[in-house]
Regions:
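Single conserved hydrophobic/aromatic residue that forms the stacking wall/gate
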Residues: 290-298
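Active/ligand-binding-proximal structured segments within catalytic/core domains
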Residues: 12-20, 120-121
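Non-catalytic, peripheral interaction segments enriched in hydrophobic/basic residues
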Residues: 247-289
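Charged boundary/loop elements
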Residues: 18-34
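Short acidic (Asp/Glu) and glycine-rich catalytic loops that position anionic groups and cofactors
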Residues: 24-28, 60, 101-104, 155-156, ...
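Duplex nucleic acid-engaging cores and interfaces of nucleic-acid transaction enzymes
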Residues: 8-13, 49
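Conserved polymerase palm-domain catalytic core
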Residues: 30-31, 45-201
Length: 298
């Protein structure tokens, strides 16, 4: 459930967050981008481009998926590692949630509706990047520099780890990640955690990232396009009898927001496809509203 704190608790959390956030920013992983000031999803995508769009870039990617990150973070770990008043933190973590007049206790996790929860989750997940950097640092072999090509890029609880080859990620990197998360009460989803070749592509933050030849391309993922088309369809089909200006007023923010998010990268084909979809939907809507001939007669 989405736990929403009371107004008093929200004010208290905001006060403690003012002191905790600078510490989290100072000690946080360098390439962590979620729930941090002056960082956004595009910064994470840009870092992926920096890492993978080079001549000798890594070609294998571990896509990590954490099972219910906010719901399963260990309270003991948070109480032992978060630099704030332990009594207050314990009360926030253990307060539970009230639904239909019944109290549901919380023995693990941090309420997703809490102002301070994203920072607590970030602190819990910070530390993996330096751990990997120390374990897989550059070596000098046979008068040559040997690179493991291990890089971590994280946005909140979504992350990818690059590697020199599939065996390195499967046999050495993945066990380290599993042990790191286990200490925090978290686990990787075996079904959703995959190792992919860059030429096959992978999805991250709504983008599909894939290499063709020597160039890296980012474009809206198929799932992102499907969700966008479904949302447009729901708006149009749910307002069959509204005025034209009302429908336009409802569609514009959705279209503009989606277009602005995906305007960077190779999005032309996706934009054309979605534009055609919107045209067909609104054309049918207009024909039904104004009792014109069937759309196929146009």
């Amino acid at each position: 459930p989405l736990g929403i704190p009371t107004m008093k608790d929200r004010a208290m959390q905001a006060l403690y967050l003012m002191a905790l956030e600078p510490i989290a920013e100072t000690t946080g992983d360098r390439f962590s981008y979620g729930f941090r000031k002056k960082r956004r999803t595009m910064d994470a995508i840009r870092q992926i481009d920096t890492v993978l769009n080079r001549q000798h870039s890594p070609e294998w990617i571990l896509e990590g998926d954490i099972k219910g990150c906010f719901d399963h973070i260990s309270h003991d770990w948070l109480l032992n590692h978060i630099p704030m008043d332990k009594t207050i933190l314990r009360k926030w973590l253990k307060c539970g949630a009230v639904f239909n007049g019944k109290l549901f206790p919380t023995e693990e996790g941090t309420p997703q509706g809490g102002i301070i929860s994203p920072t607590l989750a970030n602190i819990a997940l910070d530390g993996l990047q330096p751990l990997l950097a120390e374990r897989f640092k550059r070596l000098w072999r046979n008068n040559k520099t040997f690179h493991y090509k291990v890089n971590l890029i994280r946005y909140a609880d979504d992350f990818i780890i690059t590697g020199r080859d599939k065996e390195l990620l499967e046999n050495e990197v993945k066990p380290i990640v599993i042990e790191f998360l286990k200490e925090r009460g978290l686990t990787l989803s075996e079904e959703k955690t995959t190792i992919t070749n860059i030429y096959d592509g992978f999805d991250f933050l709504g983008f599909n990232v894939r290499k063709f030849g020597k160039r890296l391309y980012t474009s809206p993922s198929k799932d992102a396009q499907k969700r966008f088309r479904a949302k447009i369809g729901d708006i149009v089909k749910g307002h069959k009898m509204c005025k034209q200006e009302s429908l336009i007023r409802m569609l514009n923010p959705v279209i503009t927001g989606w277009g602005n998010y995906y305007r960077y990268g190779a999005s032309t084909d996706a934009f054309h496809g979605c534009d055609n979809h919107i045209y067909n939907l609104t054309k049918k809507w207009a024909c039904l509203l104004y009792t014109s001939p069937s759309p196929r007669d146009y």
